[in-house]
Regions:
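Conserved alpha-helical scaffold segments that buttress catalytic/binding sites
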Residues: 2-176
């Protein structure tokens, strides 16, 4: 078995940032994976969706991707019991955040999210996203449901199936 500091990224060819490097330094990425601007050579793309324009109360979910990147630096490259290293099983990288062309226009933001995830899907890459408020779910699904049905597991304290609020059907209470 390789030592944890010998693991090279199949995406960049560089060593993963490991326990040998301080967790408080450098640019935070999800689980300290490489930050890339291409989908080539990827199996899994880690994506931030820093948006909470669909909330009716308590904004702040837009900070979720940044904080998840920071906190995920404490996750080790392999599971301490099973000794499984997911980075040996798949080519994984952080592809950054969805960029919003007009952050205050919810419908355009939805289109930006949908287009971003469609590009990932069309490249044959599996996206794993961190958001944002619940309203980001629908455009993500629209971006990846193009050629066959997908499954979804919804875990929440309530169903979030509200109707229109304040003249909009796009909000955190109706993510699907």
């Amino acid at each position: 078995m390789k030592k944890f500091y010998d693991h090279k990224s199949p995406v960049t060819g560089e060593n993963y940032r490991t326990m040998l490097e301080p967790r408080y330094g450098g640019l935070p990425t999800f689980m300290r994976t490489p930050l890339v601007n291409t989908l080539e050579k990827l199996d899994i793309a880690l994506v931030g969706v820093p948006y909470d324009g669909g909330v009716t109360n308590r904004p702040g979910a837009r900070h979720g991707p940044r904080e998840m990147r920071s906190q995920s630096s404490f996750i080790r490259e392999f599971h301490h019991v099973t000794r499984i290293n997911p980075f040996e099983l798949a080519r994984i990288a952080d592809v950054g955040d969805v960029r919003f062309s007009k952050p205050f226009d919810h419908q355009i933001v939805n289109q930006d999210i949908e287009n971003f995830f469609r590009r990932i899907h069309e490249a044959g890459v599996l996206p794993i996203s961190a958001g944002g408020d619940h309203s980001i779910s629908y455009p993500i699904f629209k971006g990846i449901v193009t050629d066959k049905p997908i499954g979804m597991v919804h875990i929440d304290a309530h169903t979030d199936t509200w109707g229109d609020i304040w003249g909009s059907k796009f909000h955190h209470g109706s993510p699907f």
